[in-house]
From Swiss-Prot:
Annotated EC: 4.4.1.21
Protein name: S-ribosylhomocysteine lyase
Name of one Pfam family that matches: LuxS
Cofactor(s) needed by this chain: Fe cation
Stretches assigned to coiled coil: none
Gene Ontology molecular function terms on file: iron ion binding; S-ribosylhomocysteine lyase activity
GO BP, sorted A to Z: quorum sensing
Organism: Neisseria gonorrhoeae (strain ATCC 700825 / FA 1090)
HAMAP family documented for this protein: LuxS
Similarity comment: Belongs to the LuxS family.
Binding site for Fe cation: 54, 58, 128
Function recorded in the entry: Involved in the synthesis of autoinducer 2 (AI-2) which is secreted by bacteria and is used to communicate both the cell density and the metabolic potential of the environment. The regulation of gene expression in response to changes in cell density is called quorum sensing. Catalyzes the transformation of S-ribosylhomocysteine (RHC) to homocysteine (HC) and 4,5-dihydroxy-2,3-pentadione (DPD).
């Protein structure tokens, strides 16, 4: 099985919260797709709570689109990582890490402005596979943490995993 790009970076050297260009690719029609690693937690030291990450998934996708879409950028998807330390965001375009960081911080402020759980989008059994597994309070604590710590940039060159550690 091929080694995925996300496993070629040294997770012990990642900063969080931090944005990283995980991958870029060009479609046959010439569009650039960029995948960003939006790392909320320091790997193997912190983890996002399941209800909070789920609520954040519902809120973050819309708020990031509000702040980042336009001028050659269109978000395709924002999905939580299985390890619960962040999200992957795939988009058409090539925004800078700073543009993404600014949109992320603005989105976290938007999360703090949500007044109650009934305002979480798609919070019903028809649109959500686990609609009872939510916590606005946990999502807001995650947002507060990001705002307090700011958003750094993780660079692939700084995180390149030593080949001797691959499959260790």
């Amino acid at each position: 099985m091929p080694l995925l790009d996300s496993f070629k970076v040294d997770h012990t050297r990642m900063h969080a919260p931090a944005v990283r260009v995980a991958k870029t690719m060009t479609t046959p029609k010439g569009d650039t797709i960029t995948v960003f690693d939006l790392r909320f937690c320091i790997p193997n030291k912190e983890i996002l709570p399941e209800k909070g990450i789920h609520t954040l998934e519902h809120l973050f996708a819309g708020f990031m689109r509000d702040h980042l879409n336009g001028a050659g950028v269109e978000i395709i998807d924002i999905s939580p990582m299985g390890c619960r330390t962040g999200f992957y965001m795939s988009l058409i375009g090539t925004p800078s890490e700073q543009q993404v960081a600014d949109a992320w911080l603005a989105s976290m402020q938007d999360v703090l402005n949500v007044k109650d759980q009934s305002k979480i989008p798609e919070l019903n059994e028809y649109q959500c596979g686990t609609y009872l597994m939510h916590s606005l309070a946990e999502a807001q604590q995650i947002a507060q943490n990001v705002l307090a710590r700011k958003v750094a940039v993780n660079r692939n060159g700084d995180l390149a995993l030593d080949e001797s550690l691959l499959n260790a």
